[in-house]
């Protein structure tokens, strides 16, 4: 969260000593619903361009596998292992938190979610992205966040308010944007 050069250098030092490939994405889902921080950091550093597609694909695999486990589960009652439903839970938020909010996954047992951005749907008057709107946080720097917003609706306009920080703890000093429409 500090975004200092010294902290970034610490990350690079750790990466240099790591025996694992920091670009790898694996379709796994533990109790933390996390584990891809290194690959996400490499994406933010501009060194893992296809990370968004790969983490979304891995997440889809996790969801499909967990839904199959739930469908195949014939047990009833309360005599399950203490982690029975945790193992079969198809909800996975890691990719969406990283890619749309610009944040690492929160700690699974109650940690606060510290994000760079949050969204407010002005038409529905509720937090979150409007229907048919995609967001990708492409870069995070100490004084700059780059997010790409795309309206995927073929015929409806969408409006949203882009806010700084999950709790309003950040401020936008300036904003720049560009827009374009599809040519097809």
Each language-model region and where it sits:
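Catalytic domains of carbohydrate-active enzymes that cleave complex glycans
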Residues: 1-148, 152-154
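Residues in well-ordered beta-strands of folded domains
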Residues: 138, 163, 176
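Surface-exposed beta-strand/loop patches in extracellular or lumenal glycoproteins
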Residues: 153-168
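Intrinsically disordered, low-complexity Pro/Gly/Ser/Thr-rich segments with frequent PxxP/GP/PP motifs
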Residues: 168-184
């Amino acid at each position: 969260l500090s975004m200092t050069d010294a902290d970034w250098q610490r990350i690079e030092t750790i990466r240099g000593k790591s025996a694992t490939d920091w670009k790898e994405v694996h379709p796994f889902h533990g109790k933390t619903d996390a584990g891809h921080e290194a690959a996400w950091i490499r994406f933010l550093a501009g060194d893992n361009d296809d990370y968004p597609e790969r983490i979304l694909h891995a997440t889809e695999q996790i969801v499909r596998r967990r839904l199959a486990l739930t469908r195949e589960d014939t047990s009833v009652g309360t005599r399950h292992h203490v982690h029975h439903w945790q193992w079969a839970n198809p909800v996975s938020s890691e990719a969406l938190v990283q890619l749309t909010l610009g944040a690492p996954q929160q700690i699974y047992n109650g940690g606060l979610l510290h994000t760079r951005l949050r969204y407010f749907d002005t038409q529905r008057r509720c937090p979150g992205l409007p229907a048919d709107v995609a967001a990708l946080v492409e870069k995070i720097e100490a004084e700059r966040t780059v997010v790409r917003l795309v309206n995927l609706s073929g015929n409806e306009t969408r409006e949203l308010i882009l806010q700084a920080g999950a709790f309003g703890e950040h401020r936008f000093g300036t904003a720049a944007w560009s827009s374009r429409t599809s040519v097809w």
